[in-house]
Curated annotation (Swiss-Prot):
Primary role: Chaperone involved in the correct folding and assembly of outer membrane proteins. Recognizes specific patterns of aromatic residues and the orientation of their side chains, which are found more frequently in integral outer membrane proteins. May act in both early periplasmic and late outer membrane-associated steps of protein maturation.
Protein name: Chaperone SurA
Organism: Vibrio parahaemolyticus serotype O3:K6 (strain RIMD 2210633)
EC number of the protein: 5.2.1.8
Domain PpiC, residue spans: 170-268, 277-377
Highest taxon in the source lineage: Bacteria
Length: 427
């Protein structure tokens, strides 16, 4: 069945609007201050039976089927009432987007979708309005259920650790190792100081293999500290305890064991999915238009700042500190620190993403006022740990949402006034 047909079926369940004339209608169910008509039930029953015949599927007895259909219509009515109660409104733009998405999912144009709907006996305007109601009901349910969900940081951390372990189980690491041993009577703080000095040299670019040949007393010293490829479960415990999904090139340590201090290098990684983001360090000057200072005046003032900076008459830092109307960054000479561009408003984000390092922008306007910005630096930052926690949060949210949505609907049903006016099986 095409996607739109499944939506059409839901629509028929909810509104029972068909082109064929209906005999004298009557109220079948009262739901709070709303009603479900007998024609709604009859149409839904006939639609289900027709779909079952086309697909070769069997259905329960008419009485059981009717009971299920009525219950579905009651729940739909209650959710629609909740949407009205909290004031959810779906405008035409949002509705048009949803209709276009339904058409795309069925490889149709909107016009073709409308023709298909009408061919099934439902007027297209009624179809549109029912989709509007369904979106509103869905948004109301989402908003009301979210309020019931509480996710503790400890839950996120625990699941993130579990996910990391599962991911790490298949990851292979090529490990380099330097061991500095304790000797009898030696001050252990001296060994620690030596290890820290080696780590500094390694972080400054010293060759790990050469350092291992020179200083290591470990079992792989004669191989330049190379332990080859290993999964965590194959490593010595003191290694495995330190490996936490670090990237290729990471220097780990120094860390202590009973025999001395150790330094590891992750020479390479296989099978690890990492998440890296670009952070930008920028500084800016903000001038806010007022009843006295027009947009043109603010822009002119910033252009004068750019001229003075380029002429060497003043520095960006001096002007930001003296004139910027962003008090937080003005106190830091205009610097915003390393941030991901997504944190900024769109116009500012575009500037910090596209400006070369060391360049100053032309004056531009955002909701905050007029700016000039200079990009000081860019860097790649590993956000694998944050991504894992975000994934854990989404999993927990989805689990709890499904649980709470079921509980919410049961409570909604239990607290509603529902009266079956006519329980005769007309089918």
């Amino acid at each position: 069945m095409k996607i739109w047909k499944s939506i059409l079926f839901t629509t028929l369940l909810s509104c029972g609007a068909v082109a064929a004339p209906v005999e004298l209608d009557k109220v079948a169910v009262i739901v709070n201050d709303g009603v479900i008509l007998q024609s709604d039930i009859n149409t839904a029953m006939k639609t289900l039976q027709a779909n079952a015949r086309q697909s070769g599927k069997s259905l329960p007895s008419a009485s059981v089927l009717k009971e299920q259909v009525v219950e579905k219509l009651i729940i739909d009515t209650l959710q629609g009432q909740e949407a009205d109660r909290i004031g959810v409104r779906i405008d035409d733009n949002r509705l048009n987007q949803a209709i276009a998405e339904i058409a795309r999912n069925n490889n149709q144009s909107v016009e073709e979708l409308a023709a298909s709907v009408q061919a099934e006996g439902l007027s297209y305007p009624e179809f549109r309005e029912q989709i509007r109601k369904e979106i509103a009901a869905s948004e109301a349910r989402n908003a009301l259920v979210r309020r019931r969900i509480n996710i503790l940081p400890a839950e996120v951390d625990s699941l993130a650790d579990q996910l990391a372990k599962e991911t790490n189980a298949t990851v292979q690491y090529k490990i380099g190792h330097i061991q500095l041993r304790f000797t009898d009577g030696q001050d252990k703080s001296e060994v620690e100081a030596q290890a820290k000095a080696l780590v500094k040299k390694l972080n400054d670019g010293a060759d790990f293999t050469e350092m291992a040949y020179t200083y290591s007393k470990g079992p792989k010293a004669l191989q330049g500290g190379d332990w080859g490829w290993m999964r965590k479960e194959e490593m010595p415990t003191i290694f495995a305890d330190q490996i936490k999904m670090q990237n290729k090139g990471s220097i780990i340590g120094p860390f202590r064991s009973g025999v001395g201090f150790h330094i590891l290098k992750i020479e390479d990684v296989k099978g690890l999915e990492t998440v890296a983001v670009t952070e930008v360090n920028a500084r800016h000057i903000l001038i806010k238009p007022t009843v006295i200072l027009s947009d043109e005046g603010a822009k002119k003032q910033l252009n004068e700042f750019v001229r003075r900076i380029k002429a060497g008459e003043a520095t960006f830092a001096q002007l930001a500190s003296q004139y910027s109307q962003d008090p937080g960054s003005a106190a830091q000479d205009g610097e915003l620190g390393y941030q991901t561009p997504d944190l900024y408003v769109p116009e500012f984000k575009h500037q910090v993403e596209t400006l070369p390092v060391g360049s100053i922008s032309e004056p531009f306007k955002t909701v905050h006022g007029w700016h000039i910005v200079e990009v000081l630096d860019r860097r790649q930052v590993d956000r694998t740990d944050s991504a894992m926690k975000n994934k854990a949060y989404r999993i927990l949210f989805n689990r709890k949402f499904n649980e709470e949505a079921g509980a919410w609907m049961q409570e909604l049903r239990a607290s509603a006034f529902v009266e079956i006016v006519d329980d005769n099986n007309d089918n």
